[in-house]
């Protein structure tokens, strides 16, 4: 369905990090720089024989189009709940020791970290599988969206999934108008 109405977007990004943590799970949405070392420290355990760390960064192109920056937004209360459910499921499914999922909100320039996933498990194969599955589940299920800005001013809103079609937008960082 398309419409000729213009829709303005003003990000409602929390000014501080939003966290849900237990002894074995840490999920976080934050407008601040991501701390992969803190995530690694969280998942460290004497019963873990392997720790896997994934750091996703903003690349400078998408489908051969030059990207100038990304901006992430979310429905934060639901996204935190979804991330926690993902972490709980992965922890049980792969018999992991601990897991951390940290996602950036707001502006994320080229080369900066947008997501950190750390997983520990008694054995390396479980940690590898859990780390990859955590990333895919987060991209597929978490209520997080990104505005991918291209050089030249045009941008695309899309779910936080690679290769999915988005909604074209024009404009700067404030008051972005979506074309439907």
Curated annotation (Swiss-Prot):
Q: Where, in this chain's numbering, is substrate bound?
A: 123-124, 139, 146-148
Q: Does the keyword Heme apply?
A: no
What CDD domains does this protein map onto? MoaE (cd00756)
Q: What are the BP-aspect GO terms?
A: Mo-molybdopterin cofactor biosynthetic process
Quickly give the catalysed reaction. 2 [molybdopterin-synthase sulfur-carrier protein]-C-terminal-Gly-aminoethanethioate + cyclic pyranopterin phosphate + H2O = molybdopterin + 2 [molybdopterin-synthase sulfur-carrier protein]-C-terminal Gly-Gly + 2 H(+)
Keywords of the record: Cytoplasm, Molybdenum cofactor biosynthesis, Transferase
User: One MF term in GO for this entry?
Assistant: molybdopterin synthase activity
Pathway given for this chain reads:
Cofactor biosynthesis; molybdopterin biosynthesis
Question: Where do the segments described as Disordered lie?
Answer: 161-180
Coiled-coil boundaries: none
Pfam family name, one: MoaE
Q: What is its EC number?
A: 2.8.1.12
Compartments (UniProt record): Cytoplasm
Question: What does the annotation say about its assembly with partners?
Answer: Heterotetramer; composed of 2 small (MOCS2A) and 2 large (MOCS2B) subunits.
* The protein's role, per its UniProt record: Catalytic subunit of the molybdopterin synthase complex, a complex that catalyzes the conversion of precursor Z into molybdopterin. Acts by mediating the incorporation of 2 sulfur atoms from thiocarboxylated MOCS2A into precursor Z to generate a dithiolene group.
Q: What is this protein called?
A: Molybdopterin synthase catalytic subunit
Q: Organism, per UniProt?
A: Pyrenophora tritici-repentis (strain Pt-1C-BFP) (Wheat tan spot fungus)
Q: What is the name of the gene encoding this protein?
A: cnxH
């Amino acid at each position: 369905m398309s419409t000729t109405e213009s829709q303005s977007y003003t990000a409602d990004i929390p000014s501080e990090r939003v966290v849900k943590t237990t002894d074995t799970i840490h999920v976080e949405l934050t407008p601040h720089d991501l701390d992969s070392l803190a995530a690694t420290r969280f998942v460290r355990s004497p019963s873990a024989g392997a720790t896997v760390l994934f750091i996703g960064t903003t690349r400078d192109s998408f489908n051969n189009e030059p990207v100038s920056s990304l901006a992430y937004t979310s429905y934060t209360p639901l996204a935190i709940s979804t991330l926690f459910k993902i972490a709980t499921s992965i922890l049980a499914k792969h018999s992991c020791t601990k897991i951390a999922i940290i996602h950036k909100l707001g502006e994320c320039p080229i080369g900066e970290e947008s997501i950190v996933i750390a997983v520990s498990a008694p054995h390396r194969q479980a940690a590898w599988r859990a780390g990859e599955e955590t990333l895919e589940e987060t991209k597929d299920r978490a209520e997080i969206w990104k505005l991918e800005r291209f050089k030249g001013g045009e941008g695309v809103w899309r779910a936080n999934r690679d290769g999915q079609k988005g909604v074209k937008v024009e404009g700067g960082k404030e008051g972005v108008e979506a074309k439907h």
